[in-house]
């Protein structure tokens, strides 16, 4: 059995920084289009796809708190940034003919629909790509935690995190040439080793709900399809 068949329904977590490309801020449309093409490729082979996008290319809530501001307000601003990114990726997917809907944890009816579990599953059963905006809708939670929560809610077979590198390393491979890449880890090992691939809340939630995690490079063309076919470079996290 191929991974594409094993993983019928996936949730893809994309960082906001991934959308910047070579820019220092904002959205590089060509990057959004390439990520959309990768998603369309796996959708074409029957994989049901949901997506959570971060907002770090536009705003990070912790930035407000670090300058003495209110963290809750900062996180609300970050949630709005995820909505901007979600609309951008929906635009890129729509250009490819992929039916896509944005569901937000924060009500904004003129812009997108509000999230509900039943609605999300219904759209996925219809073959649409679903993008979840607004994080969890609550402050103090990362979009990694939101991705894990949504993966559990929709019954995703796996949570895929597209990052800047091709898996989980013992240290930052960009600064430490001795960093070792892991092929496989457990959720507990990530927590025990203090590996920074996801925050503790996200990893714990994934472990408690039996959600496996695959970490791969978002920058490789057709990288998502390669991972699902078992031919790419990645780290898989499962018990």
Curated annotation (Swiss-Prot):
The keyword Cell membrane does not apply. Gene3D superfamilies: Acetylglutamate kinase-like. GO terms for molecular function: ATP binding; UMP kinase activity. It is found in: Cytoplasm. It comes from the Bacteria. Pfam families: AA_kinase. One of its GO terms (biological process) is 'de novo' CTP biosynthetic process. Pathway: Pyrimidine metabolism; CTP biosynthesis via de novo pathway; UDP from UMP (UMPK route): step 1/1. UMP binds at residues 55, 75, 136-143. InterPro entries: AceGlu_kinase-like_sf, Asp/Glu/Uridylate_kinase, Uridylate_kinase, Uridylate_kinase_bac. It catalyses: UMP + ATP = UDP + ADP. Inhibited by UTP. One of its GO terms (cellular component) is cytosol. Signal peptide: none annotated. Disulfide bonds: none annotated. Keywords: ATP-binding, Cytoplasm, Kinase, Nucleotide-binding, Pyrimidine biosynthesis, Transferase. ATP binds at residues 13-16, 56, 60, 163-164, 169, 172. Its EC number is 2.7.4.22. Homohexamer. Catalyzes the reversible phosphorylation of UMP to UDP. Belongs to the UMP kinase family. HAMAP family: PyrH_B. This is Uridylate kinase. It comes from Bartonella henselae (strain ATCC 49882 / DSM 28221 / CCUG 30454 / Houston 1). The gene is pyrH.
